[in-house]
Design a protein with these regions (language model features):
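Short, well-formed alpha-helical segments that are part of the catalytic scaffolds
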Residues: 14-29
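Acidic donor-binding segment of Leloir-type glycosyltransferases
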Residues: 25-67
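Glycine-rich, basic loop-to-helix element that forms the pyrophosphate-binding segment
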Residues: 67-86
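Conserved donor NDP-sugar-binding/catalytic core segment of glycosyltransferases
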Residues: 103-133
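A recurrent flexible, glycine/aromatic-enriched loop bordering the glycosyltransferase active site
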Residues: 138-155
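Short aromatic/hydrophobic "clamp" motif used to bind/position activated sugar donors
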Residues: 91
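C-terminal catalytic/acceptor-binding lobe
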Residues: 181-364
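Acidic donor-binding loop at a coil-to-helix junction in glycosyltransferase catalytic cores
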Residues: 173-180
Length: 364
C-alpha cells in the first residue's frame, strides 16, 4: 500500500462553495501525502456535471459517481463505495462542510497507530461566520463537538475491512458513526478522541433533525427515519454484531444499471385504498421475483366526492384510505428494512399528488 492517506468525501447535491472551501484548505496542507476520493452518491445530473468541472482544478481528487439517484441518502453506502477504491493504509472520512487546518495531514501522520482509530473534535461556525473567508485560526467558533460526535475519523483501512465497512442499513442521517466505532471496539480496535486542539471547522447548515418530515415533500424522507436508525444501532450493540453487511457491501451502481431500470416505462396505477396498499407491501412486493416492478400510487378521486363524505358521516361502509404521506412512510420504511440491497428508483411528483416506485427484483 502507498505511504499516503486517503480522504473520502461522501457527497450529494450540496452547494459548490462548500466543496471549494473544503478542498482549498486541503490545497494548502503542509504535508501533501494525501489523495481524495470524492464519492458522488446520486447527485442530480446538472449538479454532478458542475461538480466534475469544479474538481478538475484539484489534481489530488478522484471523482466517483454512483448512480444512486432517486434513492434515499446513505452516508454509510457512499463511504463504503469509497473504501472499495482506497489503496492506502489509512483513510480519513471527511465531510463536505469541513475546513482543514493547514497542518491537519501532518498531524494525521503523527497520530496514526496500527490498531487505533482516531476521531476529532470539531469547531462549529455560525451561519454568518461560515460565509466569511478567513485564515483558519481567525475564525470565531460558536461551539465544539462532544466525544459522542464521531463523524470525522481516521481509520486503519484493515480495521474497517475486518468489520465489513459501515453498516448499510443506515439511511438519511444518524447513528452510522457511533455504530462503526462500537463494532471496531468489538473487533478489538480502540478509538481515541482527539481534542487537544481544533484542527477541523464545520461550516453551518440546517440539521437533518430540524427538517420537516411530518408532511410529504419531494425531498425523500419519512417521519421515523432517525428513530429507526437508533433502533438498529442499539440492536448491533446489544447483540455484538460485528459484520452487519453481506459480502457485496460498497457496491457502486453503474450508469448502465441505472439506465436499464429507468428505461422501464410501463407503470401500474395503484389507488390509496388501504387494502390495495397493504396487498402491495405484504403480498406483491415480497413474492415477486426476477422482474422490475413499476407502480404509481395516487389518491382515489372518489375519496373527495360528496357521496363518499356523506356515506362516511352516516356510517355506511366505505373504503379506508391512506394519505400519500402515510404511503410514502410505509414504502420507504419497507424499502430500507427489507430491500436496501435492491436497486430502486423512488420519486414524489413535483405536485405532491403521486408517489412512484421502480424496483429491480431480478437476482444477480
Amino acid at each position: 500500500m502507498e505511504k499516503m492517506i486517503t480522504i473520502i468525501y461522501p457527497y450529494r447535491n450540496r452547494e459548490l462553495n462548500r466543496i471549494t472551501n473544503s478542498l482549498n484548505s486541503l490545497s494548502t496542507q503542509s504535508n501533501k501525502n494525501f489523495c481524495v476520493i470524492f464519492v458522488d452518491y446520486g447527485s442530480d445530473f446538472d449538479i454532478s456535471e458542475s461538480v466534475q468541472e469544479l474538481l478538475i482544478g484539484y489534481n489530488f481528487v478522484e471523482y466517483i459517481h454512483s448512480f444512486h439517484n432517486n434513492q434515499p441518502w446513505s452516508r454509510s453506502k457512499a463511504i463504503n463505495i469509497g473504501l472499495r477504491f482506497t489503496k492506502t493504509e489509512y483513510v480519513f472520512i471527511a465531510d463536505i462542510d469541513i475546513i482543514f487546518h493547514h497542518n491537519f495531514i501532518a498531524h494525521l501522520f503523527e497520530l496514526k497507530k496500527e490498531n487505533d482509530n482516531i476521531y476529532f473534535q470539531v469547531g462549529y461556525l455560525s451561519e454568518d461566520e461560515s460565509k466569511k473567508l478567513k485564515e483558519f485560526d481567525n475564525y470565531n467558533i460558536t461551539s465544539k463537538s462532544i466525544p459522542e460526535g464521531k463523524g470525522l475519523s481516521l481509520f486503519n483501512l484493515n480495521c474497517l475491512l475486518a468489520i465489513g465497512g459501515f453498516d448499510e442499513f443506515f439511511h438519511f442521517w444518524g447513528a452510522e458513526d457511533e455504530d462503526v466505532h462500537s463494532r471496531l471496539i468489538i473487533a478489538g480496535f480502540s478509538p481515541i478522541f482527539y481534542n487537544h486542539e481544533i484542527l477541523l471547522l464545520h461550516q453551518w447548515h440546517q440539521t437533518f433533525e430540524s427538517l420537516e418530515h411530518q408532511k410529504l415533500t419531494i425531498q425523500l424522507g419519512f417521519s421515523d427515519a432517525f428513530n429507526l436508525n437508533k433502533k438498529k444501532l442499539r440492536f448491533n450493540q446489544s447483540y455484538n454484531i460485528l459484520k452487519p453487511n453481506n459480502e457485496n457491501w460498497g457496491k457502486l451502481i453503474s450508469e448502465d444499471d441505472f439506465k436499464i431500470l429507468n428505461s422501464h416505462l410501463d407503470s401500474i396505477i395503484l389507488l390509496n385504498k388501504k387494502d390495495v396498499v397493504e396487498n402491495f407491501l405484504d403480498i406483491v412486493l415480497p413474492n415477486t421475483k426476477d422482474r422490475i416492478i413499476n407502480v404509481v400510487f395516487k389518491e382515489d378521486k372518489y375519496q373527495s366526492t360528496l357521496s363518499y363524505k356523506i356515506k362516511s358521516f352516516l356510517g355506511i361502509k366505505v373504503h379506508d384510505y391512506y394519505s400519500l404521506k402515510q404511503i410514502n412512510d410505509l414504502l420507504l420504511k419497507t424499502l430500507l428494512i427489507y430491500y436496501k440491497d435492491s436497486q430502486f428508483n423512488y420519486r414524489v411528483s413535483s405536485d405532491l399528488k403521486s408517489v412512484q416506485l421502480k424496483i429491480n427484483l431480478c437476482r444477480g
